[in-house]
Amino acid sequence: MYVATSKQMKAYDQALLNKGYKIEELVDKASDAILPHCRDYDKIVIVCGPGNNGADGLSLGIKLHLRARKIKLYCFGNPNKLSKANDYYIGQAQEIGVPITFMDDDDIQLFINDARKADVVIDAMFGFGLNSEVRGIAKTLVNEINNLYNVDIISIDIP
C-alpha cells in the first residue's frame, strides 16, 4: 500500500494531466485498482459524490455491471456542478442501463435499505480534494455507512 498526502496526490494527478492524460483515463485507472477487490461480491451499492471521486465510483459501477454484478449506484450533489468526469460517467452508465438513483433527502431510507442488503458498499463520495467539513446529505450518508456493521465497506481515496 502507498500513502501520500492530498498535496502529493494533486501534484501527481496534475503531472499526468500535463503529460497528456485525460481525466477519464485517470478515473479508469482508479476504478481498475479497486476492481479486483470487488471480485467476491455480487450485490454492490456504490455511493458517488459530485466530483472525480464520484466518477471513480461510476466507472467502477459500469465495469461491475458489465461483469453481471448486481449494482446500484447512488449519486448526490448539485447536477449543475458535477465534475466533467462525473458527468461523462453518468452518461456512460445510463447508456448501458446501470441503475442510478440521484439522491435527495427523501432517498436516504432507500439507500439504507439497499445498503443493508448489499454484500459491500463502496464509498466514492469524496477524494483527496475534500477541503471542507462534510455536511448535508453527505454527512447523513457518512453516518449511515458508519452504522453498517454486517456489510463490508470499501472507500475510494479516503474513508
Q: Where are the regions that the model predicts?
A:
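Glycine-rich phosphate/dinucleotide-binding loop and adjoining beta-alpha-beta core of small-molecule
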Residues: 1-4, 41-159
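Positively charged, low-complexity intrinsically disordered leader regions
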Residues: 1-42
